[in-house]
Amino acid sequence: MAEPIQVAEEKMKKAIETLKEEFATIRAGRANPHILDKVMVDYYGVPTPIPQVASITVPEARMIVIQPWEARMLKEIEKAIQKSDLGVNPTNDGKVIRLIFPELTEERRKELVKQVKKMAEDAKVAIRNIRREALDEYKKMKKNNEITEDDLKDAEEDVQKLHDKYIEQIEKLLSAKEKEIMEV
């Protein structure tokens, strides 16, 4: 059986990965091809992410160009983007689809910062819950005489250090994302 601290670290890593994925979906006035990862198109009856049916390039800071591998997918991709909540209108020239991202207004930037702060807070709550689970597991082991009082104290310190390390990572990610959003 894995040590509670190892289980906790795995879960904390997953929480950080989830936060990074969520942050990637927030566009900060720059074209980010990852915003298309969750936009699905109908590909021969199967919902498929756009990156799996087209090549995606970012020729300019605020433009994404989508070139489908099959011409018939142009209309499908265009429809999927219009239905999505990306907030951009696709332009279809018959060969490629261009997405032009407008400059973000100050108000929109502040909304996005609020959104990323909430995401970061949710990640911190997850980390704290994981810490609590690990500590409870160690207390149970102590109660069952599987570990000594000293072992319990050491484990509590180690779990706290792990918690602090991941909370700090969240703070760094949040700070970088806020800076990216507020950059004009």
UniProtKB/Swiss-Prot annotation:
GO terms for cellular component: cytoplasm. It comes from Caldicellulosiruptor bescii (strain ATCC BAA-1888 / DSM 6725 / KCTC 15123 / Z-1320) (Anaerocellum thermophilum). HAMAP family: RRF (MF_00040). Keywords: Cytoplasm, Protein biosynthesis. Responsible for the release of ribosomes from messenger RNA at the termination of protein biosynthesis. May increase the efficiency of translation by recycling ribosomes from one round of translation to another. Disulfide bonds: none annotated. One of its GO terms (biological process) is translational termination. One of its GO terms (molecular function) is ribosomal large subunit binding. SUPFAM superfamilies: Ribosome recycling factor, RRF (SSF55194). This is Ribosome-recycling factor. Belongs to the RRF family. PANTHER family: MITOCHONDRIAL RIBOSOME RECYCLING FACTOR PSEUDO 1, RIBOSOME RECYCLING FACTOR. Gene3D superfamilies: 3.30.1360.40, Ribosome-recycling factor. It is found in: Cytoplasm. The keyword Cytoplasm applies. Transmembrane segments: none annotated. Pfam families: RRF.
